[in-house]
Amino acid sequence: MNTNQRIITIGTICLIVGIISLLLQIGNIISLWISHSIQTREKNHPEVCNQSVITYENNTWVNQTYVNISNANIVAGQGVTSIILAGNSPLCPISGWAIYSKDNSIRIGSKGDIFVMREPFISCSHLECRTFFLTQGALLNDKHSNGTVKDRSPYRTLMSCPIGEAPSPYNSRFESVAWSASACHDGMGWLTIGISGPDNGAVAVLKYNGIITDTIKSWRNKILRTQESECVCINGSCFTIMTDGPSNGQASYKIFKMEKGRIIKSIELDAPNYHYEECSCYPDTGKVVCVCRDNWHASNRPWVSFDQNLNYQIGYICSGVFGDNPRSNDGKGNCGPVLSNGANGVKGFSFRYGNGVWIGRTKSISSRSGFEMIWDPNGWTETDSSFSMKQDIIASTDWSGYSGSFVQHPELTGMDCIRPCFWVELIRGQPKESTIWTSGSSISFCGVNSGTANWSWPDGADLPFTIDK
């Protein structure tokens, strides 16, 4: 074979090998395309599984969570039945108070991402209890915590988290922009009330299930403010009290009735020489009872009770066991304001039982420190200072602060009565301690008709923090 023949032979072999390789590549592409088409058709026609479809009526929501596990769509259905919280039951008979929650937020905040906050309160639906609180738009041990002793700023927001958990950006839910607030559940949805804006023109924004439903404009242009604790819902209607006017003189007080977040009725109290601020309200046998703060001139606490048509009665707790702070030493009470050492005050609460009353108060008569519960069997109507029981909550050497009431409805507890509960704010930082910030943690207790403990459950944080040094 000569040279030209060898060249032609080699070229022919290379051409044949190239053609075979090209055909193999084309076949590989066709195979991949067919395989992809088969997979696509399988995804577009998933295997049908046996599913039960349950239809709920009467204002019921069904929450469905889709969880992707190994490319399999699994539907986890959770039915949540809504009801109307009746609020028609009486308060449960109790003999003392059992510790219910403690969030330790200041202790945890020395190292964790915890909100700077104050004015915490608790409210329960028929399914859960949540802690609500007013943040300062800052975290503990961070530079933005500086100057958070200020009550009203555009950075304050109402948020909530599960009860007993330290409030952080990771477990908290935004509710409203607010420096004064209230919230409650009617069995069908959460109502939140958040007040924000300038002192001479603040506005309360009402939300129902997170949607704005109504607003209330300041009517006296002197720091519109509300409860800093839960509102009250009875038979689908919810009730709150707001104050507008001086903190050290006669102001204006209004009761609002709301349904699904919309105001349907309001009245202004005819209450000369009374001062109502930061009311702690609860339902009792279809009516609302509120025990409030007199920041003007009383050592004892004013109250207002009203029915669902807003027919109301007013008074002061008569007992000589005084509940405000600062206050006079216990002595002769009055069913009107006890004027001795009555200027200024602190948010607080009491529970009425017929002629008797459970009074929650600081142990100190001059500073927000210590806390105790006192049972005065005739203190709602009589003026003596005798009482039959005292339960220690916070030692007099530890800081306390605001306190307020909340309840657990029979729809939550399964009991045939409304369980009374209360929370105590444990304020730390400015103005009493050497920090750049002011914040608080909280504890809560619920009434029981069984054994309880006398002890102290303080905040317990070791101050100052790194940011303060």
UniProtKB/Swiss-Prot annotation:
Residues 1-6 are intravirion. One of its GO terms (cellular component) is virion membrane. Substrate binds at residues 118, 152, 277-278, 293, 368. Inhibited by the neuraminidase inhibitors zanamivir (Relenza) and oseltamivir (Tamiflu). These drugs interfere with the release of progeny virus from infected cells and are effective against all influenza strains. Resistance to neuraminidase inhibitors is quite rare. Its main location: virion. GO terms for molecular function: exo-alpha-sialidase activity; metal ion binding. InterPro entries: Glyco_hydro_34, Sialidase_Influenza_A/B, Sialidase_sf. Glycans are attached at residues 50, 58, 63, 68, 146, 235, 454. Belongs to the glycosyl hydrolase 34 family. This is Neuraminidase. It comes from Influenza A virus (strain A/Swine/Wisconsin/1/1967 H1N1). The lineage of its organism: Viruses, Riboviria, Orthornavirae, Negarnaviricota, Polyploviricotina.
